[in-house]
Amino acid sequence: MIRAYEQNPQHFIEDLENVRVEQLTGHGSSVLEELVQLVKDKNIDISIKYDPRKDSEVFANRVITDDIELLRKILAYFLPEDAILKGGHYDNQLQNGIKRVKEFLESSPNTQWELRAFMAVMHFSLTADRIDDDILKVIVDSMNHHGDARSKLREELAELTAELKIYSVIQAEINKHLSSSGTINIHDKSINLMDKNLYGYTDEEIFKASAEYKILEKMPQTTIQVDGSEKKIVSIKDFLGSENKRTGALGNLKNSYSYNKDNNELSHFATTSSDKSRPLNDLVSQKTTQLSDITSRFNSAIEALNRFIQKYDSVMQRLLDDTSGK
């Protein structure tokens, strides 16, 4: 017996791992391998995630599409057997359902799915001829809309947060010279903002895939001499003076700023740099709130779909029980 995915996705996955794919209803479906390949080609990630509002037992988050055999079992679990009578009513109903599944996988902007949501959408896409199409369409359209908006907001927030992180690195460097009452060179003796270690990265490839790197690679560069050879860096001046970022360019920059108790240009520079990033900080807070709201709406659509599934299954079970009791 395979426990229901709606109640505990961890138990559902454990049960699937303990059966052979040949034991599942859709193992012989003519479209099983096609759907497996479609999920892979669309880079769809299906994961189980602990939700304290739904799950009584804590379990580790897991991306289950990393395991192709497990993905095959998940698809075989909800796929029905092929119709024996080709061209009949059941066969037509089944083919229409499979067509909807394929269309959904190919057109949905969302590629990150929690198992409950994925199974719910697949189940209803496959069986839509037997339930209320209008209700299903409203719920799934809502999920797609909020899922797409959530993805775009996440990308925008990642870019904003990365730019803010670069400003924080610059501010830390300025503060270091302020505390020592020294001079900061922001040009040819500047720290290299392309240094991955400044942002907590240890792997160069991971850094090059980061939002910080994507911003920095659009900046002008300064050529410096290191051990007799030329090296290009992104200096503090390069970054602050560039238009190629959300906050725009900071004008009238000098190459260096010194501490002076009577006319403290270093302190003024620190304030100017901080003021430049303040609207960005406000925007990050605003976008974070928007993302939280969109995520809440997306989760509400998933919950509505799951409640609809449970109600539908409950009604069908009662009908089956009544029929078998006669």
Swiss-Prot record:
Keywords: Plasmid, Secreted, Virulence. Transmembrane segments: none annotated. It is found in: Secreted. It comes from the Bacteria. It holds the Pfam family LcrV. Possibly involved in calcium regulation of YOP expression, which includes the export process. This is Virulence-associated V antigen. It comes from Yersinia pestis bv. Antiqua (strain Angola).
